[in-house]
Amino acid sequence: MEQTYPRFTPDMKKTHKILIPNMAPVQFRILAASMENHGYQVELLGNCGERVAELGLKYVHNDTCYPALLVIGQFLDALDSGKYDLDHTALIITQTGGGCRASNYIFLLRKALEKAGYGNIPVLSLNFSGLEKDSSMPMDLKFMRQALAAIYYGDLLMTLRAQTQPYELEAGAAERLQNKWLDILCDEVRHDKGYSGREMKAVMPRIAAEFAAIPVRRVPKVKVGVVGEIYVKYSPLGNNELEKFLASQDCEVNLPGLMGFVQYCAYNMAETVRLYGGSLVEKTAAEAALALIAGMEKVIIKTLKDAGYHAPMPFSELIKLPEQSHTIGMGCKMGEGWLLTAEMLELVRSGYENIVCAQPFGCLPNHICGKGMVNKIRELYPEANITPIDYDPSATRVNQENRIKLMLAVARERLSERREPPADLPKVRTSVSAKLSKPKSLCANI
């Protein structure tokens, strides 16, 4: 049967504003700048509140994934606001193409739009799986490079801020510096700069040096890692501002980068061919993508270490953890799959043994690869202090935070039992000058 939904045509590029749901605020802000560089008019949504969830429940079945409820509710709330010309507005949503129900969000969104009286609004699909060929956003090499740069930069900024903010002497210094660099990077990407490997290698040490120059007092704090379903893990709307809550409890938070999920998806393409057979072309392409990403991953790890920050484990080492620990097989790749288990193992091994596993209620991959692995990880690492938290329209924020507080109480008790290091640790000196003003171009003087 022929599809009757409206399509986003090339001529709409100049006439329509595209609304983007806000999953990963830092990375998506740079990604939005990349779309503007390609001639699109875009806006990253920031609306939140109870009405978003209520609209999601009204127009989507309540048994559907919580992230779907929120994304669709956020779109409908924005369209109801009166801020947009509804004849010149479009929406965009991602599709993984995997077995997770997230691949069906676009159909649920179209159905909800029709019910709500917005059936004329086209929806684009952002995917790398060849889905929605008549309504997908065109992917050229330049856009893919800019998208990767958005994630590289976003992960770096997120990591630097998270490891600086809990110890800063001047409240808000790390947040302001992150916003400063976001403004610079977005401006550069809009003007078709800043995303080449050469430019990123030159700029990243400068960013790290400025964060390292922020006056801090390194005192022992509870370190908490956050893992889980990708939307609930990163979105403040999806996890009730989990990172902000943990900061209010005087914790240092480690939120593994979004690039790990991209690498996970590429690795799974190659692993599928190895396990079940298939296209060698796809396997070769996936391995080439992993090699490309690994090159910049080394730059980020070196940048963090040189500036005195904790760096994540290389993906090539991360993929060994599940099978080395006999926890889960690499063929388990629905949703976040084995990556979720691997991230918990890495966090515990690197000193972030207190972990919040954020999961939408009823998310089968999370219950198997997250909650289902907790006992096994505790057997391997008795110090692991892991609490799974369900996020759902019916789950109250107070109950979620109380469960996290119980986990933190155990963490603080263990911290007090340890031998405390000196209150003021010497700052790590870097060879990169931190006295930088906003450059006219990131390419300047390279």
Label each residue range with its predicted role.
Residues 1-446:
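An N-terminal assembly and electron-transfer interface module characteristic of large anaerobic redox
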